[in-house]
A protein has these predicted regions:
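Conserved blade-ending motifs and adjacent loop-strand segments that build the rim/top face
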Residues: 204-221, 247-270, 301-309
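Short glycine/acidic-enriched loop and turn motifs that connect beta-strands
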Residues: 44-46, 87-89, 128-132, 180-184, ...
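Bacterial Sec-dependent N-terminal signal peptides
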Residues: 1-29, 121-123, 305-338
């Protein structure tokens, strides 16, 4: 009897996509403002509780699917919005209808920008377009249905970027890594290796640190925030950025890290961690799972943010200069020992001295 109860409780924490649709979702978004999951297929958009209950479904025509396919889903006051990933278009799902509400035009100037909500506004930072990377914020005001540019005071700004890791905690927007454009060859990009923080109330930027340890860090839906740390995977290893001391940490690996579905979200809720895994036997067997020990990620070691190679080069260079200076002074001292000094009553060679009697 006890075994049956345990099995029932276990399967209640799994949500098989076959219950939602015969199609595997093209994308899944976790909407923290509403604590719901949004599944998108070519035929419908489905809303569910994290535990699996379906709370809403919107059938899509071919035209509607094209409108929301390349979009990021957000929510304000339980109303869902779909923000075009390239820039411009905003669609709203309300009262079982999908409608475009923005008064802007479609463009491709903010591809791979960071999209988030703050105080009932939809923000996006950075993005790539027309051989350039943006370093400013735009926001969509749901009152006027217009995109506006965020105006800030003159200050030191991060380089223009796109495809950055990002997250919002309280009044701060954090940006980690990403890519930027080579100013001398705008057909090429290179990875950024820095961490910046923007105060969304004061409108001020703060450069937190630079790092050399990671070759590149870019956006992933597997990134998540939990217990004042930002967690992410890199080369099948779990890491965290600690917000309390602004350091990177290597974490003991999550047991199922190799089975995580890369384009589906990981998120924490009610002290639990939720994640998607796929079966190696059948592609359709994808489930959302609950890990009840969200606070038990152990730190293996703290990551040095700078490459030790540069430090070694500096030390070797310093020692070389000291050696050259010592060698120079030593030669000078030996040379001085060979000089004969003739005085009125003596002849001196180094420490040797010959007295001269005056006749």
């Amino acid at each position: 009897m006890i075994i049956c109860f345990i099995l029932i409780m276990f399967f209640q924490s799994l949500l098989n996509f076959e219950e939602l649709t015969t199609e595997i979702p093209l994308s899944v978004d976790y909407i923290p403002a509403s604590e719901v999951l949004l599944y998108k297929t070519s035929k419908s958009i489905t809303l569910t509780r994290v535990e699996g209950q379906i709370i809403g479904k919107l059938p899509l025509t071919v035209n509607q699917f094209e409108q929301v396919n390349n979009s990021v889903a957000v929510a304000i006051d339980s109303i869902f919005y779909f923000i075009n990933e390239n820039g411009g278009f905003v669609y709203r799902w309300h009262n079982d209808e999908l409608e475009r509400i923005d008064n802007s035009y479609g463009h491709r100037s903010q591809m791979m920008s960071s999209i988030f909500t703050y105080e009932k506004k939809i923000y996006r930072h950075g993005g790539y377009g027309f051989f350039d990377a943006r370093n400013f914020f735009t926001f969509f005001d749901i009152e006027s249905n217009e995109w506006e540019v965020e105006i800030i005071d003159e200050q030191i700004l991060p380089l223009g970027s796109f495809d950055s890791k990002f997250f919002v905690v309280e009044n701060y927007f954090y940006k980690i890594g990403g890519e930027t454009i080579d100013p001398f060859d705008r057909t090429k990009s290179y990875p950024l290796k820095d961490v910046w923080r923007f105060n969304l109330k004061d409108k001020t930027w703060e450069h937190l640190l630079d790092f050399d340890y990671f070759e590149t860090l870019t956006f992933s839906k597997n990134d998540f925030v939990m217990n004042n740390k930002f967690y992410f995977t890199n080369q099948n290893q779990l890491y965290a950025f600690n917000l309390e001391n602004n350091t990177f940490e290597q974490i003991e690996n999550f047991p199922l890290i190799e089975k995580l579905v890369k384009n589906y979200p990981i998120f924490s809720k009610d002290a639990n961690l939720f994640y998607f895994t796929s079966s190696s036997n059948e592609e359709k067997q994808i489930s959302v799972n609950k890990h009840s020990k969200a606070g038990n990620f152990k730190v293996e070691r703290q990551i040095s943010t700078h490459d030790n190679t540069s430090l070694i080069i500096w030390i070797v260079g310093f020692l070389t200069v000291i050696l050259i200076a010592f060698n120079f002074l030593n030669k000078k001292r030996k040379k001085e020992k060979k000089i004969i000094f003739v005085k009125s009553n003596s002849i001196n060679l180094g420490k040797k001295k010959i007295e001269i009697d005056v006749i």
